[in-house]
From Swiss-Prot:
Record key words, sorted: Chloroplast, Iron, Iron storage, Metal-binding, Oxidoreductase, Plastid, Transit peptide
Binding site residues for Fe cation 2: 182, 216
Example of a GO biological process term: intracellular iron ion homeostasis
Gene Ontology terms, MF aspect: ferric iron binding; ferrous iron binding; ferroxidase activity
Subunit structure: Oligomer of 24 subunits. There are two types of subunits: L (light) chain and H (heavy) chain. The major chain can be light or heavy, depending on the species and tissue type. The functional molecule forms a roughly spherical shell with a diameter of 12 nm and contains a central cavity into which the insoluble mineral iron core is deposited.
Membrane-spanning residues: none
Domain Ferritin-like diiron: 81-234
Gene3D superfamilies: 1.20.1260.10
Function: Stores iron in a soluble, non-toxic, readily available form. Important for iron homeostasis. Has ferroxidase activity. Iron is taken up in the ferrous form and deposited as ferric hydroxides after oxidation.
UniProt record similarity statement: Belongs to the ferritin family.
EC number: 1.16.3.1
Protein's name in the database: Ferritin-1, chloroplastic
Amino acid sequence: MALSSSKFSSFSGFSLSPVSGNGVQKPCFCDLRVGEKWGSRKFRVSATTAPLTGVIFEPFEEVKKDYLAVPSVPLVSLARQNFADECESVINEQINVEYNASYVYHSLFAYFDRDNVALKGFAKFFKESSEEHREHAEKLMKYQNTRGGRVVLHPIKDVPSEFEHVEKGDALYAMELALSLEKLTNEKLLNVHSVAERNNDLEMTHFIEGEYLAEQVEAIKKISEYVAQLRRVGKGHGVWHFDQRLLHGVHGA
């Protein structure tokens, strides 16, 4: 099929080969536009070899906006993507919560490790709790860096060093304090989760659910049982037996 070169409608997806005088077809890829004149040469229209399947993903085109968005300014994260400022801020707050909880537990460890208190099982339990919350803080710090946020450490509040209680005794009082602390930590974690949901950050919600919430519920259940048992034994000889169960890791204490 031969077409004159005066005026053409626009064609897409076709290769056009100019026909020489001897009828030999030469490769040529052109766009035909309305009103454009191409001289006296004739063109043959034929389908290209590439199938017209419809392009749904053009990586070099679609990456342009992300490539241009990659910061070149020093101290600006290259990894950050879809990470809201509110999410970054609440993670820093939770880091502070975990470090404060660790600090309280470390003070409890020091108290029960004294020579005139000498409840080694309680000291062991509270030291392990302190280390666990510190690990939680460090995990949050690592996550913050992974998402391209910036870790900002807030001040840690002073904590008491004496935990004797006239009515309850130090063991029960300390364990009730631990229970309140775990419940408060859980509330703070739920707030972190809600902030992630509000900002449609699915990765962050999965991180908090998988790494913290289930473990926190288990901790609350365990310490609740400890409080119930200590309320039964009172302040006397039963506290020593309970301490020994904590020290040797006996199931149920």
